[in-house]
């Protein structure tokens, strides 16, 4: 098994954004409300690039009727939302197998608090703010290829719980797609399906 690069979606795959958002709202977040927020964020991203924190904030104003001030505070703190329990140890193990990089629809400001939670830096970080586009836009993947020095192909594995954002474009580029069965994940065609990142590390380690 040849793996030259592992790239990861962050929000919803490495970071538990539903729990983070629920905690920020004082423990009140129904499943259908979360799904509406995710869908609204996707619609806003398709309208053109703007900082992810502002997209989070607008989706909360529109779907939950939060005040703009409260919504902006929550959006700015998104990088501090908790990791899934398996993420840090699994990513540490996976970095011993191949370079690990983030491809994320988030802001540069989110990198430091996320890596602080991990306890180590990832080998690369390709975020929407740098690229000026959101996944599934192919520009994100081209930026990752240039940054990491790896051409798209089957030895580049992309790991995500959101096939609609990630795997359609990744598969079109010839990447190996790994689907992670997180709560509220969005499945689609994948080359490998795992229940969490711990299982992925065990399967390919």
What role is predicted for each listed range?
Residues 32, 63, 69, 94-97, ...:
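Low-complexity, intrinsically disordered/propeptide-like segments
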Residues 53-54, 72-102, 112, 138:
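Short, acidic loop-to-helix structural element flanking the phosphoryl-transfer center
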Residues 3-85:
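N-terminal helical cap/lid subdomain that shapes the substrate entry/recognition surface
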Residues 40, 96-97, 121:
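Structured helix-beta-strand junction loops
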Residues 23, 46, 73-80, 100, ...:
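Residues at structural and domain junctions
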Residues 1-6, 18, 88, 92, ...:
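Asp-based, Mg2+/Mn2+-dependent phosphohydrolase catalytic module
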């Amino acid at each position: 098994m040849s793996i030259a690069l592992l790239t990861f979606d962050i929000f919803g795959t490495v970071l538990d954004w539903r729990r983070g958002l629920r905690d920020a709202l004082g423990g009140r977040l129904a499943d259908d409300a979360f799904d509406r927020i995710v869908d609204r964020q996707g619609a806003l991203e398709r309208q053109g690039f703007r900082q992810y924190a502002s997209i989070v904030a607008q989706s909360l104003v529109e779907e939950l009727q939060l005040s703009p001030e409260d919504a902006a505070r929550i959006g700015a703190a998104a990088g501090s939302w908790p990791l899934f329990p398996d993420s840090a140890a699994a990513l540490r193990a996976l970095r011993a197998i191949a370079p690990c990089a983030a491809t994320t629809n988030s802001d540069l400001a989110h990198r430091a608090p996320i890596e602080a939670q991990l306890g180590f830096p990832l080998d690369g970080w390709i975020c929407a703010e740098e690229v000026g586009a959101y996944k599934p836009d192919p520009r994100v993947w081209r930026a990752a290829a240039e940054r990491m020095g790896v051409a798209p192909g089957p030895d580049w594995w992309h790991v995500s719980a959101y096939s609609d954002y990630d795997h359609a474009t990744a598969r079109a580029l010839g990447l190996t797609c790994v689907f992670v069965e997180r709560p509220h994940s969005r499945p689609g065609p994948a080359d490998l399906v795992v229940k969490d990142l711990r299982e992925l590390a065990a399967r390919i380690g």
